[in-house]
Amino acid sequence: MMNHARGVENRSEGGGIDVVLVTGLSGAGRGTAAKVLEDLGWYVADNLPPQLITRMVDFGLAAGSRITQLAVVMDVRSRGFTGDLDSVRNELATRAITPRVVFMEASDDTLVRRYEQNRRSHPLQGEQTLAEGIAAERRMLAPVRATADLIIDTSTLSVGGLRDSIERAFGGDGGATTSVTVESFGFKYGLPMDADMVMDVRFLPNPHWVDELRPLTGQHPAVRDYVLHRPGAAEFLESYHRLLSLVVDGYRREGKRYMTIAIGCTGGKHRSVAIAEALMGLLRSDQQLSVRALHRDLGRE
């Protein structure tokens, strides 16, 4: 297996925009690679016609544009593909930009299996067999592969492994952080639809029944202290934080960069808010996490 996943030097001489062209065999993971680049902050254009690539670059070079990193996914829709790629390279060279080419590939057996699982036909298959379509594409793209800056063989890579390869090459500091949202809510208003994990903290005494705490929220120090000093609260936070650390590590390995943890109480005003804030503080001890708290039902009463 060839997997030249290493840091690839930015060769844009103009300094205005960095361009990556993602190409390779159909079914080898171009789309997944594009999603990873998007997560890393790249502006991604999927299946952009070759004649429009230079226009997109010109837009990125224009004053006021926020596009500094452009990734374009190019697939083999015509037999003039190699010539199209050469034309794009030549046009960009006139703008002092040398695009980096990422070539995605996989073994024939792997590609056949993926196509059969997805029940799709190969773009070059036509009246031929699937294997013949794959072979034709390999021959067509051989010149592109020979000059690619980065070749990634996805035959034995999981989605997480492919993500790691792309991040090592283009992520700068070795990869993006995982964004975690700790969301408090009230069960009487329904479950958050986007939650990855839901925890019920109604086992803790409700400050609603304490007259001086009732009008306050879980963000107030008096309510926070009341909730966090109830029996079992500290033990719960310690245990749940330890559990979440294991889950977050698994999410990272699988390439998932966004996670929502929902913490619920009756109305989403006292207990869930205090626990969510405390949990956010614990999770922020992990420097690879970007953590925020969201209080969905606060002020709803």
Curated annotation (Swiss-Prot):
Q: Name one GO cellular component term.
A: plasma membrane
Query: What residue stretch is flagged as signal peptide?
Result: none
Q: Which UniProt keywords apply?
A: ATP-binding, GTP-binding, Nucleotide-binding
Q: Which domain of life is it from?
A: Bacteria
Positions with a binding annotation for GTP: D75, V76, R77, S78
* Keyword Nucleus among record annotations: no
Per UniProt, ATP binds at G24, L25, S26, G27, A28, G29, R30, G31
Q: Which SUPFAM superfamilies match?
A: P-loop containing nucleoside triphosphate hydrolases
GO molecular function term, any single one: ATP binding
Parts forming coiled coils: none
User: What PANTHER family does the database record attribute to this sequence?
Assistant: RNASE ADAPTER PROTEIN RAPZ
Query: HAMAP family from the entry?
Result: RapZ_like
Query: Which miscellaneous remark does the UniProt record hold?
Result: Was identified as a high-confidence drug target.
What role does this protein play?
A: Displays ATPase and GTPase activities.
Q: Which family does it belong to?
A: Belongs to the RapZ-like family.
Q: Write down what this protein is called.
A: Nucleotide-binding protein Rv1421
Q: Which organism is it from?
A: Mycobacterium tuberculosis (strain ATCC 25618 / H37Rv)
